[in-house]
UniProtKB/Swiss-Prot annotation:
Gene3D superfamilies for the chain: P-loop containing nucleotide triphosphate hydrolases (3.40.50.300)
Reactions accelerated catalytically: CMP + ATP = CDP + ADP; dCMP + ATP = dCDP + ADP
Transmembrane segments annotated in the record for this chain: none
Molecular function, one GO term: ATP binding
Keywords (A to Z) from UniProt: ATP-binding, Cytoplasm, Kinase, Nucleotide-binding, Transferase
GO cellular component: cytoplasm
EC numbers on record: 2.7.4.25
Protein name, as recorded: Cytidylate kinase
GO terms for biological process, alphabetical: pyrimidine nucleotide metabolic process
Cell compartments where the protein resides: Cytoplasm
Keyword Cytoplasm attributed: yes
Species in which this protein is naturally found: Haloquadratum walsbyi (strain DSM 16790 / HBSQ001)
Length: 192
């Protein structure tokens, strides 16, 4: 089984992905973990590699290529990243998009990173705008198009302990034999 969990910063991807992976006996592969691996391979910290990525688009492409390769070549994976659903493409059994209003996500990020909510909100907005442009330019992906996702959950509506339960019920009920069709992923340029 290949599950993907995607969403913007602060939506609860990692928390939810950890729980889902444990429940379904899947290996949790995080885009953040792969980014840290890329940094280590280059003898850099994640912060240093992130700074380089601002000037060198090949760093993003290397990360995305590695995530796509994992999605296509490995079994029993939960792939978690902003683009996981897009990168896994039709190899994914279930694609999940988690989201929450910006003010809620900024509050979560502020708590996690020990900064003010206003700072977290402005940084998040700037980051999201930058990433949306890059994804469109690199791969022709409109990150605001959620039509490819099988499940979309506003994580602000339920306690964080309940969100995985909601998804677990839907995923456990999934029967590939009775699947009448997922939304295809079309016109994406996997140019790494």
């Amino acid at each position: 089984m290949l599950l993907t969990v995607s969403g913007p910063p602060g939506a609860g991807k990692s928390t939810t992905a950890d729980t889902l992976a444990a429940t379904f006996g899947l290996e949790h592969v995080s885009g953040g973990d792969i980014f840290r691996e890329l940094a280590a391979e280059r003898g850099l910290t994640a912060v240093e590699l992130n700074q380089q990525a601002e000037e060198d688009d090949q760093i993003d492409r290397d990360l995305d290529q590695r995530l796509r390769t994992i999605a296509l070549e490995r079994d029993d994976i939960l792939l978690e990243s902003r683009l996981a659903g897009w990168l896994a493409g039709d190899a994914a059994d279930i694609r999940v998009w988690l989201d929450a209003p910006l003010n809620v996500r900024a509050g979560r990020i502020a708590d996690r990173e020990d900064k003010s909510i206003s700072t977290a909100q402005e940084e998040t907005r700037t980051r999201e705008e930058s990433e949306a442009l890059r994804y469109q330019n690199y791969y022709n992906i409109d990150i605001h198009d959620h039509s490819i996702y099988d499940l979309r959950v506003n994580t602000a509506r339920w306690p964080k302990t309940e969100v995985p339960d909601i998804l677990e019920a839907a995923i456990a009920a999934y029967e590939p034999a009775s699947d009448e069709g997922r939304f295809p992923i079309e016109d994406i340029i996997y140019d790494f």
